[in-house]
C-alpha cells in the first residue's frame, strides 16, 4: 500500500476519536490517520455523504460498530474511493424489531436526562465479561459519550434504526477487506462477522481472544497488529481464515 494513502477510522455509537488512540502510533506509519466526524446527521446516507465530501480522493477505511454501517454506505456511494476496508465488530444486517425498541427506549432516556445511565448500560454490553469492573474502560465510555453529547447520541441512534440491509451488497465489495471481532462480543455476536466475511470475496476474518465489542482498547496490541497487516498487505484479494 502506498505510504501516502490516508487512513479513515470511523468510530461507533457514542464513540469518539479516543477509541482509536491506542492504535494511532502503529498506523500512522502507513499514511495520515484521521477520524471523521459522524455525529452531525441522523441518516446513514447523509453521514456518508458528509464524510466523503471532507475525505481525501482515495483512502483506507475502517469502521467500528456503527462505523461499519457508515462504511457500508460509503461503499454504496463511492466504492472506487476505498482502497481497503476493515469492518470491526459490526454487521451487515438491518436493525431487528427488538433492537429498534431498545434504541427508542435509550433515546427517550437520554432526552429525559438519563444519558449517563444509558452509557452505563451500553458499557455492560460493550466489554468482555472479565472487564466489567474495569474502571478505566468505564471512564472511557463516559468520556466518549461526553465528547459527542446526548443530542448527537439521539441522531446516531436514529441513523442506526433506519440503516438498510447491507447483505445484498457484500458480494460487490472487491477491495482487500479485514473483518475483525472479539470472541465474546455481547453487542454484535461474532457469528455476524463470520456472515460478513463469508459474503465478501477474499475477506480475512480475525476473532480476537478475551475481547468484547471494543477491541481497540480491550486488546489494543492484537488489534493494531491486525490492522497493520491489513494496511501493509499488497495482495488484492486476501485469503479468508476461520
What positions do the PLM features span?
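Flexible "cap/lid" loop of the alpha/beta hydrolase fold
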Residues: 44, 76-77, 81-120
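Catalytic histidine neighborhood in serine/cysteine hydrolases
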Residues: 194-213
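Short alpha-helix in the alpha/beta-hydrolase fold that links the catalytic acid
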Residues: 175, 189-198
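Short beta-strand/loop motif that positions the catalytic acidic residue
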Residues: 173, 179-181, 185
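Gly/Ala-rich beta-loop-alpha elbow adjacent to hydrolase catalytic centers
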Residues: 63-67, 71
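Catalytic histidine-centered segment of alpha/beta-hydrolase-like enzymes
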Residues: 211-224
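Conserved HGGG/HGGXW glycine-rich cap/lid loop of the alpha/beta-hydrolase fold
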Residues: 1-50
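Conserved alpha/beta-hydrolase catalytic His-Asp/Glu region
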Residues: 95-98, 113-172
Amino acid at each position: 500500500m502506498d505510504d501516502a494513502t490516508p487512513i479513515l477510522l470511523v468510530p461507533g455509537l457514542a464513540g469518539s476519536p479516543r477509541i482509536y488512540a491506542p492504535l494511532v502510533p502503529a498506523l500512522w506509519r502507513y499514511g495520515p490517520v484521521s477520524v471523521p466526524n459522524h455525529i452531525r446527521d441522523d441518516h446513514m446516507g447523509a453521514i456518508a455523504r458528509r464524510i466523503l465530501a471532507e475525505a481525501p480522493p482515495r483512502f483506507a477505511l475502517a469502521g467500528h460498530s456503527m462505523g461499519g454501517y457508515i462504511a457500508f454506505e460509503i461503499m454504496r456511494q463511492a466504492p472506487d474511493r476505498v482502497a481497503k476496508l476493515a469492518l470491526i465488530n459490526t454487521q451487515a444486517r438491518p436493525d431487528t424489531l427488538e433492537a429498534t425498541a431498545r434504541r427508542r427506549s435509550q433515546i427517550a432516556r437520554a432526552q429525559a436526562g438519563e444519558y449517563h445511565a444509558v452509557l452505563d448500560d451500553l458499557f455492560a454490553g460493550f466489554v468482555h465479561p472479565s472487564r466489567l469492573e474495569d474502571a478505566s474502560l468505564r471512564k472511557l465510555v463516559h468520556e466518549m459519550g461526553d465528547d459527542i453529547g446526548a443530542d448527537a447520541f439521539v441522531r446516531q441512534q436514529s441513523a442506526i434504526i433506519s440503516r438498510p440491509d447491507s447483505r445484498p451488497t457484500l458480494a460487490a465489495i472487491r477491495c482487500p477487506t479485514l473483518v475483525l471481532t472479539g470472541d465474546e462480543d455481547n453487542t454484535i455476536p461474532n457469528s455476524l462477522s463470520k456472515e460478513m466475511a463469508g459474503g465478501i470475496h477474499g475477506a480475512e476474518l480475525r476473532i480476537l481472544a478475551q475481547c468484547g465489542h471494543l477491541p481497540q482498547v480491550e486488546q489494543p496490541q492484537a488489534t493494531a497488529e491486525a490492522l497493520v497487516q491489513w494496511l501493509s498487505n499488497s495482495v488484492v484479494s486476501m485469503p479468508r481464515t476461520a
